[in-house]
Amino acid sequence: MTTDQPVISLRPGGGGGGPRGGRLFAPAFAVAASGSGDFLRPHGGGASGVSRIGDLHSESRERVRYSRDQLLDLRKITDVTEQILRLQQEIEAELNGDDQSWVRNDSNVQLQTQAQPQVQAQNRFTETDNRDWRARTEKPPAPAVQEEKSWDNIREVKEQYNASGRQQEQFNRQDQSSSQKAQVGPPPALIKADVPWSARRGNLSEKDRVLKTVKGILNKLTPEKFDLLKGQLLDSGITTADILKDVISLIFEKAVFEPTFCPMYAQLCSELNDNLPTFPSEEPGGKEITFKRVLLNNCQEAFEGADSLRVEIASLTGPDQEMEKRDKERIFKLRTLGNIRLIGELLKQKMVPEKIVHHIVKELLGSDKKACPDEEHVEAICQFFNTIGKQLDENPKSRRINDTYFVQIRELVANPQLTPRSKFMVRDLIDLRSNNWVPRRAEIKAKTISEIHTEAEKNLGLRPGATANMRNGRNAPGGPLSPGGFSVNRPGTGGMMPGMPGSRKMPGMPGLDNDNWEVQRSRSMPRGDPLRNQGPLINKVPSINKPSPINPRLLPQGTGALIGKSALLGTGGPPSRPSSLTASPTPLPAQTTASPKPSSATPASVPIPDKAASSAKVIPAGLQKKTASLLEEYFGIRILDEAQQCIEELQSPDYHPEIVKEAINLALDKGASFVDPLVKLLEHLYTKKTFKTEDLENGCLLYGSLLEDIGIDLPKAPTQFGEVVARLILSCGLRFEAAEGILKAMEDTFFRKAIFTSVTKTLGADPAGQAILSSHAAVVDACNSLSI
């Protein structure tokens, strides 16, 4: 019989006795046995070792021991598959759960955990197995309580591991922060200010409190609030000489850097000098300290210190000092001119004697008459004489001295060293004195609000007090009535100045005139330039720089003067108060009926006057305001007889076309609901013989000439105006030929088409209107050609 094949015993039940052992290790050991004779010991035949599978466990066999090197040789042919590694990771994940504290941030630990399965797989075969697996007794199964305890043990171990991991992470962070601090170094120390800010406002000294109060008063000082703030300044607590000096320094700095307000500050200095007490001198035997003496000392120091400042500025020659030099030059110039201006204003307040003024002029001109003064000195001289030249010439003695000064000043013009700018300043000064110190342009100075409004009224041609009425008006429209039945209270304007949002009145239309007639805003008076509204009546020019779009030949005689010029482009008289009005009462040939004339092949046209008549008739200046007021009253109460009575009381038949124009304008401005009251008013006045056909036609012509400007703000005005014209034609108040004249009075074909379309639509809806259209086919064709 053959000997058995050698059997390997590494695990319980291992070796060649089992089927698994034979399949796994027999080929490998066969190769190993063929390679080395001493590697495996013969134990039996090879065939019998495989065939006797059932008797392996029962028979005693010799244990085979392997050295470390032999096992390492076996490792070379053993590879751990990826499937086994994946299963290992899944098992570890099930045991560890979702606790993220198991994973550490340290990269070395991560590398170690990644390589752990491979190291464990390697360590299985590096140690020699000396245990007797056959003699090991089988343990009984553990009860369920032990399983729970085992899970508790695993949980405890896991918690301990987590705690140790957190401690390790904290230690790593501390170590990392300490290493960063070691690299960066300690933080820089805070730099404390020499005079740190403190929130303890209640600990201010008496002097600081007074100066703070004075600063606030000076910052709010204006000519309007002068009296109020002057009293507060006197009561601020100027009780010592030190406080007085600091207060004077604050006033001096404000006056120097705000030369426009120098007159106000000079007046303030005069008031303070008269009301503040004097203080004893700090030196024995010295003069007492007064406001005037301290102020003049400041002015003298600023004037005499200009040379040292000029030298200091000239020393700044470095390229990096150019910006600093420019700033100091600007401040130096402001201080010099401001100081000169303040000294001049103090002379007007009689706080500076004239001898100081003459001393300053001599210093600025220089002792050498042939030498050219500095440009700063020349500008200061011109500023000085602009301020006090008139006052010096009022005194005969000072005037003779001024003559000597101006002889030297005239010589400066011919000096080639003087800059052109300085030459022009000197020439302006010479011209100013020759013109008796009346400047060509108004001097810029601080003004009160009332002075600003007075100047605005003068420039805009308003009645004195118009802006004050606009600002202060608070009365409601429903006040007492005048004898004519109209309200004499002016409605509130809603705005402080003319043209401001919310204001009802426009410039040139103040509240009430001397006859207590209320004035209402009119759309024909545009919202742009108020001077365009100041014509003799209520007419306007569509643009100042372009002629009126209306053809004066289409207007009635005498109205060309009303439309052709505004007060701004006229004779140059006061625009808001014309003294006379030139008008020609020559009427158009009357045609009282509008009966159709089928046999007429040539359409009748509005007669064209060749020239205005020379006769003149004076119309009251307040006629325009009364017209606007009575129309407003009518559209409010809509009583036809009362409106007729008011119009007849005007006693101005030549002004009736203007009334028609204003009525149309005001009604269309208010909206479509006022078209019917407008037509009823015009028809009533025509029926009562108050208005004639010529009045209605000329009034429509006037409004048509303004429609191009009005239509911008009122897009529906052309259509509504066409409806008014058509209804007046139906009532025989207008001839149909007047529609052609109205279309010719405007240039925009869009407005022409809108008006004529509305006329034909309104007439076509009435049988009488259809007859008028059919009988005036030639006029219709002419109007259609104008609308294309």
Swiss-Prot record:
Listed PROSITE patterns: MI
Renumbered residue ranges of the record's region Disordered: 1-21, 113-197, 472-608
Chain intervals with Basic and acidic residues compositional bias: 126-139, 146-159
Spans through the membrane: none
Boundaries of every MI domain copy: 622-744
Matching InterPro entries: ARM-type_fold, Initiation_fac_eIF4g_MI, MIF4G-like_typ-3
Residue span, MIF4G domain: 211-436
Biased composition (Polar residues): 161-182
Family classification: Belongs to the eukaryotic initiation factor 4G family.
Subunit text: EIF4F is a multi-subunit complex, the composition of which varies with external and internal environmental conditions. It is composed of at least EIF4A, EIF4E and EIF4G. In higher plants two isoforms of EIF4F have been identified, named isoform EIF4F and isoform EIF(iso)4F. Isoform EIF4F has subunits p220 and p26, whereas isoform EIF(iso)4F has subunits p82 and p28. Two forms of p82 have been identified, p82-34 and p82-16.
Name listed for the protein in its UniProt record: Eukaryotic translation initiation factor isoform 4G-1
Organism, as annotated: Triticum aestivum (Wheat)
Lineage: Eukaryota, Viridiplantae, Streptophyta, Embryophyta, Tracheophyta
